[in-house]
């Protein structure tokens, strides 16, 4: 029998508002939405930002006759609900969705349902919620509640965010995922909640909207930094930390720098990216980053020297040949497998007559695949400078 796994897919990772400019294309610009497929086949959707539209289009095109999902919503700010009107499966009567979130002191009874109705009310949207014939059920939960979805147990905890926010601890038969976005450090009660949620988690997804310096200038906005995530991850014995809810003004290069700083203190750190998939099994967690091809690539034959860190953290330095090159990235073959989302130093030998110096570049690892020769790996990189 095949080993059981839980599959976690990232459909939206940006915070506050979607971004579409070129400087953010590698990590992505859609607002929060994750999808978890549990070992017993249950589908959980975490938050309903604009990434929900992309997920919905994928589900609508799938061969599934009935789409059935449990949707856990952390809170009611725009970036966590704005995908609902564009979620294609809600417009098909055979589909079933069960929503969970908290009863807001500002809204009262049926808070989540009323929020969805309000954002689609006239004059804000062409049609209202009645245009969605899918079955919709709503359950109020509060901080500290526990409930089951199939063989998966869910625990909630209050986080420190304006107007309230829930974090979710999701314990599957093969491991634990904690989703704790939108939390500002500094309140002891909420710190204890977050620590309890994160305790021993295999995957800890945490708010990293700001740098530590930016955080000091944004007190009261309800967000955190990579340093706070690292601190909780170490204290709670987390296996993998995922930096999430990237600031809309953070470019890919800025997030690269945040990731480098975090990995210097906690090696098993990842920066959430649209299309990223984390597969959680009983023995390990595998991570796949989406392949990025944003320009015409040409077959090439440039000698190069590549240095970086292997997956076990040891350094390597190797001469190789680049065979697939564009202005934005390359495919290179190495004897050692580097860590995904790590930085490589690439020095390309000038193929001319020696009048020009070799070109030194930095590359960001976006994929790893089997190479053409035994004991080789193909490494896809995007040039960062």
What are these regions (language model features)?
Residues 176, 184-274:
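Cap/insert and terminal regions of metallo-dependent hydrolase folds
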Residues 1-178, 188-189, 194, 255-282:
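Binuclear metal-dependent hydrolase catalytic cores
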């Amino acid at each position: 029998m095949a080993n059981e796994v839980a599959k976690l897919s990232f459909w939206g990772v940006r915070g506050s508002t979607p971004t579409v400019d070129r400087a953010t294309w590698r990590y992505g610009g859609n607002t929060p939405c994750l999808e978890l497929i549990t070992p017993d086949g249950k589908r959980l959707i975490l938050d309903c930002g604009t990434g929900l539209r992309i997920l919905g289009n994928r589900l609508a095109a799938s061969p599934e006759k009935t789409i059935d999902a449990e949707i856990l919503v952390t809170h009611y700010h725009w970036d966590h609900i704005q995908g609902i009107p564009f979620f294609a499966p809600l417009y098909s009567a055979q589909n079933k969705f069960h929503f969970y979130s908290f009863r807001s002191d500002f809204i009262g009874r049926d808070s989540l349902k009323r929020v969805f109705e309000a954002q689609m009310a006239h004059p804000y949207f062409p049609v209202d919620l009645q245009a969605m014939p899918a079955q919709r059920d709503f359950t109020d939960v509060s901080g500290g509640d526990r409930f089951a979805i199939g063989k998966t147990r869910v625990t909630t905890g209050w986080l420190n965010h304006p107007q309230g926010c829930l974090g979710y601890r999701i314990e599957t038969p093969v491991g634990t995922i904690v989703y704790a976005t939108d939390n500002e450090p500094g309140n002891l009660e909420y710190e204890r909640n977050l620590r309890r949620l994160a305790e021993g988690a295999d995957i800890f997804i945490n708010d990293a909207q700001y740098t530590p310096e930016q955080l000091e200038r944004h007190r009261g906005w309800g967000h955190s930094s990579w340093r706070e995530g690292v601190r909780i991850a170490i204290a709670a014995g987390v296996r993998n930390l995922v930096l999430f809810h990237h600031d809309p003004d953070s470019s890919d290069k800025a997030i690269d720098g945040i990731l480098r700083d975090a990995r210097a203190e906690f090696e098993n750190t990842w920066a959430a990216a649209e299309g990223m998939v984390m597969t959680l099994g009983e023995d390990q967690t595998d991570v796949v980053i989406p392949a990025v091809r944003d320009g015409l690539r040409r077959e090439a034959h440039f000698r190069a020297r590549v240095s970086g860190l292997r997956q076990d953290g040891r350094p390597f330095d190797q001469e190789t040949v680049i065979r697939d090159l564009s202005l934005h990235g390359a495919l290179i073959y190495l004897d050692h497998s580097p860590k995904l989302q790590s930085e490589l130093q690439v020095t390309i030998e000038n193929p001319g007559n020696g009048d020009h110096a070799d070109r030194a570049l930095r590359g960001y690892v976006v994929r790893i695949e089997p190479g053409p020769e035994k004991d080789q790996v193909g490494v896809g990189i995007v040039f960062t400078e």
